[in-house]
């Protein structure tokens, strides 16, 4: 059902492209797509042991560019400077576990493709089991991250106020080093990053608290107003999803349970199906009631005749 709905959306996107008569390139001459990303944000973007930039988002961007015949330029950026990089034209998009929620009006967004949660990671022997247990504790978070935004939101102001301290680190590798050393008691982080970091460390040494800080979704952020590039890239992602390539990549990087492409269409389809079933039930009940009334009327008429 999900892929059928995605196919319908893909057809509509392609039709819009045909109507406009425009083929969009990040760079009309060299046909490049310059993707800005945090180079220390596994499993979405990072440097592997061979010195290559890889990750779910970067590999997906690579496949999109292969389909379009473009060159992908992977550009590591200081996450705190991402808006400057985008608005100055140094990069074409921010594609790296980038949270939509709370930034809806700041970028031209793709559709959401991954569900995400902001969570807390603590040492297993810390005695911290709930968010309430973080009262009086030292918490670290990445600068300019969605986790920081979540902690500063009105929904979590009481939680954040309970901390002994909230310290911003330049990246999550530094944040986890602070947990390792005991300089911090907990790190607020995206669930995908948390799972990756725990998999790289001693088994059972760290745990993710059950209660999330915030639920959200990832999208690709383009410069405000750049709908044509957004639509071109998203159309290719839908094709890759239809071909099973997105799910394959997600499984490779262990984020398959976060995929949400087509979820809105599924919800609409389920709602339509429920409405249709309800209408059928109502029709059946009305038919049955009418039949019963007709039978009763006939019996009454027969009795009167006798």
Feature map (PLM): residue ranges:
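Periplasmic-binding protein-like
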Residues: 39, 115-122, 191, 195, ...
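Acidic, polar ligand-binding/catalytic clefts
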Residues: 58, 62, 66, 71-133, ...
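Extended ligand-binding regions for polar small-molecule ligands
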Residues: 58-67, 128, 132, 137-138, ...
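Gram-positive cell-envelope targeting signals
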Residues: 1-28, 32-35, 64, 72-74, ...
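Ligand-binding clefts/hinges and TM-proximal coupling segments of bilobed small-molecule sensing domains
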Residues: 71, 146-169, 202-208, 235-273
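Immediate post-signal peptide segment of exported/extracytoplasmic ligand-binding proteins
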Residues: 24-53, 66, 127-138, 202, ...
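A ligand-binding cleft/hinge motif common to bilobed small-molecule-binding domains
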Residues: 81-84, 97-106, 150-154, 178-214
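Bilobed "Venus flytrap"/periplasmic-binding protein-like clamshell domains
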Residues: 39-42, 53-66, 98, 119-173, ...
């Amino acid at each position: 059902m999900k892929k059928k709905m995605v196919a319908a959306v893909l057809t509509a996107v392609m039709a819009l492209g045909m109507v406009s008569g425009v083929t969009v390139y990040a760079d009309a001459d060299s046909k490049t797509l310059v993707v800005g990303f945090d180079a220390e944000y596994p499993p979405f973007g990072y440097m592997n042991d061979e010195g290559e930039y890889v990750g779910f988002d970067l590999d997906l961007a690579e496949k999109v560019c292969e389909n379009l015949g473009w060159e992908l330029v992977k550009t590591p950026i200081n996450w705190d400077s991402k808006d400057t990089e985008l608005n100055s034209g140094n990069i074409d998009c921010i594609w790296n576990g980038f949270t939509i929620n709370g930034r809806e009006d700041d970028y031209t967004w793709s559709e959401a493709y991954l569900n995400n949660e902001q969570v807390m990671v603590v040492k297993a022997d810390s005695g911290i089991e709930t968010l309430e247990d973080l009262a009086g504790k030292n918490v670290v978070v990445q600068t300019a991250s969605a986790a920081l935004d979540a902690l500063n939101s009105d929904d979590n102001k009481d939680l954040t106020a309970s901390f002994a301290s909230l310290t911003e680190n330049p990246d999550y590798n530094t944040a986890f080093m602070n947990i390792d050393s005991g300089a911090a008691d907990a790190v607020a982080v995206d669930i995908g990053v948390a799972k990756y970091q725990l998999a790289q460390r001693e088994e059972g040494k760290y745990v993710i608290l059950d209660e999330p800080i915030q639920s959200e979704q990832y999208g690709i952020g383009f410069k405000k107003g750049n709908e044509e590039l957004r639509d071109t890239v998203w159309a290719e992602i839908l094709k890759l999803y239809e071909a099973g390539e997105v799910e394959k990549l997600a499984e490779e990087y262990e984020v398959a349970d976060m995929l949400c492409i087509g979820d809105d269409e599924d919800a609409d389809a389920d709602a339509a199906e429920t409405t249709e079933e309800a209408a059928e039930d109502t029709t059946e009940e009305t038919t049955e009631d009418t039949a019963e009334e007709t039978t009763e009327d006939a019996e009454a008429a027969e009795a009167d005749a006798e």
